[in-house]
Swiss-Prot record:
Lineage of the species this protein comes from: Bacteria, Pseudomonadati, Pseudomonadota, Gammaproteobacteria, Alteromonadales
Family designation: Belongs to the universal ribosomal protein uS2 family.
PROSITE patterns: RIBOSOMAL_S2_1 (PS00962), RIBOSOMAL_S2_2 (PS00963)
SUPFAM superfamilies in the record: Ribosomal protein S2
Entry annotated with the keyword Ribosomal protein: yes
Top-level taxon of the source organism: Bacteria
Stored InterPro entries: Ribosomal_uS2, Ribosomal_uS2_bac/mit/plastid, Ribosomal_uS2_CS, Ribosomal_uS2_flav_dom_sf
Protein name: Small ribosomal subunit protein uS2
GO cellular component terms, A-Z: cytosolic small ribosomal subunit
GO molecular function: structural constituent of ribosome
UniProt keyword terms in alphabetical order: Ribonucleoprotein, Ribosomal protein
Keyword set includes Ribonucleoprotein: yes
GO biological process: translation
UniProt organism field: Shewanella pealeana (strain ATCC 700345 / ANG-SQ1)
Length: 242
């Protein structure tokens, strides 16, 4: 099972929160103290809470569940995409479009348009258009790919969303809450933990911290998917040779 240790977190700087003047009092239970005007997060809480979240994600993946990685701020977007792709899951790394979950029917139409344009770009359709029309469609394709590329093969709502930066992604969290989709989120000392099923109190700005979260969640999803494949193989009558 994927787990993260106190040492891993210390090395990644997970314990460094925001400046004390920007704190959210709702995070008080997870704060150890302050040093040089910066809140220090109590990793005695974060370690078990993160490992519980990883076990939950692994369990979701073991049942063929869909995990949606969400991180649209600059520090998180690249790591979010890499991690989701590495474990065959889904991601939003550019901008959260309002209604992405709650208005899925409309989003699905946009995904259909994206896939149509992708087909046109490779089957020669663009070559038959005027330069202006081809350019317009290329721009539309790029725009849709940026917004929806990470969910174009999701085929329905996710079973859990994993969020880096609860304050930045509050719209995504609210939509998931409205639909009863569980939320796993990294919550820094300046954010509210409300509406989050699995709170991970930790630094949501440092690249090393973000990579620790995203890579661990990807590993948990892979491990869960491996369990699912092992069960499937057993059901299909495949047994590994000694």
């Amino acid at each position: 099972m994927t787990t993260v240790s106190m040492r891993d977190m210390l090395q990644a700087g997970v314990h460094f929160g925001h400046q004390t003047r920007y704190w959210n009092p709702k995070m008080k239970p997870f704060i150890f103290g302050a040093r040089n005007g910066v809140h220090i997060i109590n990793l005695e809480h974060t370690v078990p809470m993160f490992n519980e979240a990883l076990a939950f994600i692994s369990n979701v993946a073991s049942k063929k569940g869909k995990v949606l990685f969400v991180g649209t701020k600059r520090a998180a977007s690249e790591a979010i995409k890499e991690a989701a792709v590495s474990c065959d899951q889904y991601y939003v790394d550019h901008r959260w479009l309002g209604g992405m979950l709650t208005n899925w029917k409309t989003v699905r139409q946009s995904i259909k348009r994206l896939k149509d344009l992708e087909s046109q770009s490779v089957d020669g359709t663009f070559d038959k258009l005027t330069k202006k029309e081809a350019l317009m469609r290329t721009r539309e394709l790029d725009k849709l790919e940026k917004s929806l590329g990470g969910i174009k093969n999701m085929a329905g709502l996710p079973d859990v969303i994993f969020v880096i930066g609860a304050d930045h992604e509050h719209i995504a969290i609210k939509e998931a809450n409205n639909l009863g989709i569980p939320v796993v989120a990294v919550v820094d000392t300046n954010s509210s933990p409300d509406g989050i099923n699995y709170i991970i109190p930790g630094n949501d700005d440092a690249m090393r911290s973000i990579r620790l979260y995203t890579q661990s969640v990807a590993a948990a999803a892979k491990a869960g998917r491996g369990q699912d494949l092992a069960v499937q193989a057993e059901q299909d009558g495949f047994v590994e040779a000694e």
